[in-house]
Amino acid sequence: DGLSIYRRIVKEAKEVLKVNGLLILEIGYDQLDDIKQILNENKEYKIIEELKDYGGNDRGIICRFQGK
């Protein structure tokens, strides 16, 4: 489904991020809702900001690791 790498990054980042550390993901223009769902399933992350490119397309998401 093209999202498996995001699931892996979100899972493995927990092992290296400190509390309040940032996880910044570059995403495809049509992936925001799916990525938000992955992050929301992992309660340790809080979405801080959604980033758009100059064309107004979704291009990134910033979240904070809140700890295990």
Predicted regions and their residues:
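S-adenosylmethionine
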Residues: D1-G67
